[in-house]
């Protein structure tokens, strides 16, 4: 049965990508539509080979990003020219949640996998005086206002839970500020508190893999801003809501990254703020790659030397031991990784 569901999902995803290619081709050209499809195949290959990126693959991805930005420019049309980019100078009311760390697990932590629980505990442990608010299906409306039409599209299945999370994230940051980090971040130090001192923050590893147009210059699962810079996320949110107001389908899974780059193209002040984010957490993805390996204290000390946030995934099964020796995963879930 599991295999049958997996095959059905693969067929469904292939159909989605073929339809996306058709829509891109109508706006750009047939040749460019095929180029984006080829780049998506490259991404799937990279997902399975440890994200090895040779020069040919990199060029395919960069070409895709160029095509997709032009595609979205045509999709947004006059909105890009008529949008009021000066609204950032209007003062936003102060929020009582400005110092909060926002973490979302829709079903509630009681239903979360062990890895997620450990990660959230690590965030709380290193949050200092910052409140950690766990958002769920039952409580998120207490903290944020989302347009009714968005809720209706979500209930109809037009906006998926993943893309609804994008709207939630941007809405929280636009309305309150504070920090949003994914529930699968394992935090090892007080560096988390330091990021609140910046006007704008995101994990930043310049010239990282090019599967996303972000290429390490930002990571949309990790954002923070102070009260005075909430307008940055208000602009990005306005763009995102405009897209969903006019469209009922997503052309690219990494749309939010394209959107953030598009906003920077049309708003030089936002581009400057992103440029000013200091590089941080260079080893963010490295713990994930060795979760099933035998724990090695020297390797662990080396990883956390200049990184305090490690992005993990709850979707994979890891052994707790290997040849009688605890793995990195085993140390993590036994709360011995610190």
Over which residues does each language-model region extend?
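Active-site acidic Asp-centered loop
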Residues: 176, 181-183
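Small-residue hinge/turn detector
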Residues: 166-176
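Glycosyltransferase-associated regions of secretory-pathway enzymes
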Residues: 2-165, 186-338
């Amino acid at each position: 049965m599991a295999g049958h569901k997996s095959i059905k999902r693969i067929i469904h995803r292939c159909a989605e990508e073929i339809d996306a290619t058709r829509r891109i081709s109508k706006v750009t050209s047939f040749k460019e539509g095929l180029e984006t499809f080829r780049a998506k195949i490259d991404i799937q290959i990279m997902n399975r080979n440890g994200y090895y990126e040779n020069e040919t693959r990199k060029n395919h991805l960069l070409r895709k990003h160029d095509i997709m930005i032009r595609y979205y420019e045509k999709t947004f049309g006059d909105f890009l020219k008529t949008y009021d980019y000066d609204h950032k100078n209007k003062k936003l009311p102060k929020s009582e949640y400005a110092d909060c760390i926002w973490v979302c697990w829709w079903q509630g932590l009681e239903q979360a996998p062990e890895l997620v629980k450990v990660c959230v505990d690590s965030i709380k442990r290193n949050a200092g005086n910052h409140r950690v608010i766990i958002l769920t299906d039952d409580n998120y409306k207490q903290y944020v206002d989302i347009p009714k039409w968005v809720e209706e599209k979500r209930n109809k299945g037009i906006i998926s839970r993943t893309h609804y999370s994008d709207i939630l994230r941007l809405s929280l940051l636009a309305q309150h500020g504070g920090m949003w980090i994914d529930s699968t971040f394992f935090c090892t130090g007080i560096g988390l508190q330091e990021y609140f001192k910046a006007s704008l923050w995101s994990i930043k590893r310049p010239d990282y893999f090019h599967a996303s147009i972000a290429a390490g210059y930002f990571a949309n699962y990790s954002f923070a801003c102070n009260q005075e810079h909430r307008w940055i996320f208000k602009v990005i949110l306005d763009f995102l809501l405009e897209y969903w107001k006019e469209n009922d389908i997503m052309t690219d899974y990494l749309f939010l990254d394209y959107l953030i780059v598009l906003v920077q193209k049309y708003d030089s002040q936002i581009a400057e703020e992103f440029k000013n984010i200091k590089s941080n957490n260079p080893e963010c993805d490295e713990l994930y790659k060795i979760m099933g390996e035998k724990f090695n204290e020297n390797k662990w000390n080396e990883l956390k030397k200049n990184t305090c946030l490690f992005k993990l995934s709850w979707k994979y099964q890891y052994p707790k031991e290997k040849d009688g020796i605890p793995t990195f995963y085993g140390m993590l879930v036994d709360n011995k990784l610190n």
